[in-house]
Amino acid sequence: HCRKEDIPLLGICYGMQLLVVEFARDVLGMDAGSEELEDDFEHLVIKQMQDQKQVEKMGGTMRLGSYTAELEGEVSEIYGAEEVVERHRHRFELNPEYENKLEAEGLEVSGRNPETGLAEFVEIGQKTFFIGTQAHPEFNSSIENPNPLYHEFLKSTL
């Protein structure tokens, strides 16, 4: 709904994953889903990270901590930088096998980890504000110093 009606949207972690699934289903017409929910979709656009597949005992095994993202597009403008460090807590990622198809229809990967190549941010630049991040910007935000994503998201709603 937000994408179609150009309503500002900020997808955080699982929210980013769901906006990718929605885009793949509605725009690309795929039977798309996330491996986190179930794996009987024809197109798993969200998959478990390779280094998480052998984890048998959960607890402290996620991709945790601060990671760098190299930025471009609107996200780079929002942060006023070409690189940012944000904190993470997840096991699933955008399946890189689908990036070209998503980007061809307008969902751009606008932030990527330089070491792993993982997609950290996605966006649709033609929209008022349509950004997803695999990170948790709330971990680096306070009343005195709000994370730029929150600041710009709220501005876009006014």
Question: Language-model segments: what does each one mean?
Answer:
Residues 1-7, 12, 25-158:
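Amide-donor transfer/coupling interface in amidating biosynthetic enzymes
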Residues 19, 24:
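Conserved active-site segments centered on acidic
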Residues 14-16:
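Active-site loop->helix "elbow" adjoining a glycine-rich segment at hydrolase catalytic centers
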